[in-house]
Amino acid sequence: MASQIDQYAVFGNPINHSKSPFIHTLFARQTQQSMIYTAQCVPVDGFTEAAKHFFAQGGRGCNVTVPFKEEAYRFADRLTERARLAGAVNTLKKLDDGEILGDNTDGEGLVQDLLAQQVLLKGATILLIGAGGAARGVLKPLLDQQPASITVTNRTFAKAEQLAELVAAYGEVKAQAFEQLKQSYDVIINSTSASLDGELPAIDPVIFSSRSVCYDMMYGKGYTVFNQWARQHGCAQAIDGLGMLVGQAAESFMLWRGLRPGTKQILRELRKNLEGAL
């Protein structure tokens, strides 16, 4: 790339609605970093070629979103521990020796958002709904917060069992089928994308209590259907995934630039945009 300005991007398909360029442009302005961040829509079979070209042309780093996170994992020359455990990469960085480092900042983004919302994770009982890539990416960061217990539940019980076994070296995680859930939890995290389709998991609402904090990784205008359901059953607090989006972006920015940007103002701006106030 001819420009002297450092180049960053997000790769995905579709990518039109990505908020990453908005977020990282504000991060750069806030921290007085000279950089350009663009959105790149890549053919579903063209990620590796596009990423190679981007870095060959001087690109410094990129984010990776659906459906390329697993391919980015294979593309990276080196992996952080959290990326290796997640089995997926959402952040790539070109190192001084020319190799590409793969990282996964999703779990840290979730934890930082929960802590920013004054959610107590240490000593908490946590229920994680879903056993896909999103769940896999957040388990170790959650275990690092020393909860009393983490239970993974999934429509297909075998997947929950596999995920619990995968992280066993980092801490005990229980696996339960939906129909086995017969108690309430302090923190309930929905890692599935069901809310985007207006669907709810087939789980007994006994999981909710007046002390429960409920977190849906999806977000939209107003409450997600999962958070509406949680509120109807008396949960103390219902949070969507917009703060996780900003948190994982801040962690990526830190990896690239060595500076941790503030997130509160940017989260407020995004929320205004989402609610149609701007």
Curated annotation (Swiss-Prot):
**The keyword Chloroplast belongs to this UniProt entry's keyword annotation:** no
Give UniProt keywords alphabetically.
Answer: Amino-acid biosynthesis, Aromatic amino acid biosynthesis, NADP, Oxidoreductase
What are its GO biological-process terms?
A: amino acid biosynthetic process; aromatic amino acid family biosynthetic process; chorismate biosynthetic process; shikimate metabolic process
One Pfam short name: SDH_C
Q: Which domain of life is it from?
A: Bacteria
Q: Which GO terms describe its molecular function?
A: NADP binding; shikimate 3-dehydrogenase (NADP+) activity
Q: Where along this sequence does the record place binding of shikimate?
A: 18-20, 65, 90, 106, 223, 248
GO (cellular component) term, any one: cytosol
Q: Give its E.C. classification number.
A: 1.1.1.25
Binding positions for NADP(+) per the UniProt entry: 81, 130-134, 154-159, 241
Which HAMAP family does the entry mention?
Shikimate_DH_AroE
Instruction: Summarize the subunit comment.
Output: Homodimer or homotetramer.
Q: Of which family is this protein a member?
A: Belongs to the shikimate dehydrogenase family.
**NCBIfam families assigned to the protein according to its UniProt record, in alphabetical order:** aroE (TIGR00507), PRK00258.1-2 (NF001310)
Q: What does this protein do?
A: Involved in the biosynthesis of the chorismate, which leads to the biosynthesis of aromatic amino acids. Catalyzes the reversible NADPH linked reduction of 3-dehydroshikimate (DHSA) to yield shikimate (SA).
Question: Under which name does UniProt file this protein?
Answer: Shikimate dehydrogenase (NADP(+))
